[in-house]
């Protein structure tokens, strides 16, 4: 999808299960020890969108943990949600996380 920068899947305890980014990060996300606290603070939140000056972070609760999608300002949020709706049920049935790469496919329209 256009303007999607990265995808991460974390367990409920803050362990990084999967990550994929368009370009390398300056600091690896698994080096942060506050992910568990962050996810605990989400408590019963199923979906959240955090908006920053130059980017957005879409967070979706799954049965495995939290799916986080890092986007630029112009990413189509409706398409991100739709892809999550399709992807999340499939995560339960697979042992690989290759389906998460769908966020990096270009729209053909």
Predicted regions and their residues:
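Acidic, low-complexity cytosolic segments
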Residues: 1-6, 11-109
């Amino acid at each position: 999808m256009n303007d999607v920068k990265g995808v991460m899947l974390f367990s409920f305890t803050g362990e990084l299960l999967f990550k994929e980014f368009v370009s390398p990060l300056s600091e690896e996300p698994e080096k942060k020890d506050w992910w568990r606290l962050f996810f605990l603070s989400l408590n019963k939140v199923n979906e959240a969108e955090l908006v920053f000056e130059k980017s957005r972070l879409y967070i979706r609760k799954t049965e495995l943990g939290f799916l986080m999608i890092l986007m630029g300002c112009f990413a189509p949020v409706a398409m991100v949600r739709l892809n999550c709706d399709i992807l999340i049920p499939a995560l339960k049935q697979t042992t690989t996380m290759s389906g998460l790469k769908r966020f990096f496919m270009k729209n053909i329209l």
